[in-house]
């Protein structure tokens, strides 16, 4: 038995090197809860290690999906050491009693490398996060994983650590699956959902100071995330949130996974983040900002505009955008809005993605943001099941019909637990044993999850998908008389790269106002601009 103050927890956050991602709230809240109960807690985060080749930021700049920013190097220095060696050294120095991994499907294999190192030193390993929640059998089957935590893990992990510290059985801890020495698995059910208004404030002190910085609209800012709510009331087929709703509803635990923090809790937490960590920019961490009750938004807007006033970024859906809401956001000091378009074909978007909105609605919503002079980043995804080149050009044409400051174009990868994953599985599009999982034909660096695809589609090749992603912004912004040359730029060879570089110079003239932007509103859908 150990006193809690002598029990050491080491959390591991496997991440792609120098990926421009925000601080994860999950491990931060877990650390806060453990420390509040007296446990020691540290974090090993792989984000700041030097990538093999370009960083994700450099790669996105090349594809014109990220504005050229002030030098990140001035704020963030990369680590040139080997992360596995550093992890071994930390284990020897810190001597943790347990190691916990935070896993996504994209980072599972990376995380297992660290689990293997920990188990070689006889340190028990548990894994939590979205991947163990929706692929629990695969994760617990790995020989380097001893326990998994499904669903919300904050207090489940606390109870688990208490049991370990007290030399008590972990067999009956809610949310946990336990692998016994004989290989049998104890599968406990989920516990109740947490009250998001009663959670402690996140402990971001476990992260290195450089992790607070992120490029945003051409600047490098000290950005901190603010969790507004958990889950989402919408039912997008590619997203895990609807599966979270089903996970808890099917067990009779809750009617929905989606819960919002109160405006008072949000404001109090924002004051804490500013005072404790010196935030000068806020990212409202929510799948859909306006999923909160409208009365809560009105209250939040009023207090934020009086007490906080920091610039902020949010993401939302087109159908939630109204002139009145945007007026209040501007009063709050909104800096950038991220809007999910995802696909430009109405029929496909409704049938496959379960996003029932018209292209005209999207155009009208983006027009409201344009009239308000707000920079907009639009998200697009391609490589969905049964997608064709023609369908992808529907998405490109929709992007040509709206005004945006930045365009993101991601390649779809199916996540276990989602409705669209099941479509891919039933149609045989998932890689089989021994198949090459992904192709990185236009990557000169370590593969990032949104710039590769694992699907084997009969309707379009991986190489063509990568070429369309490479040129998506050029197709969306340059005049149509350049389409023949852009098609050459899709190629993954010397000729294609030379043409891409040539057209990229022309694109820079476009964004500098030297060439007229192709907002083909009258041509496309008969809209006006």
Protein language model regions, located:
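A short, glycine/small-residue-rich beta-strand->loop->alpha-helix junction that serves as a flexible
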Residues: 16-25, 103-108
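Charged, glycine/proline-rich intrinsically disordered loops and linkers
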Residues: 50-82, 245-258, 441-446
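Radical SAM enzyme core and accessory elements
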Residues: 1-14, 19-20, 29, 35-36, ...
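Short hydrophobic segments within beta-strands
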Residues: 12-14, 44, 102, 128, ...
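Conserved C-terminal portion of the radical SAM core fold
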Residues: 36, 50, 98, 126, ...
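Radical SAM [4Fe-4S] cluster-binding motif and immediate context
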Residues: 197, 202-377, 397, 513
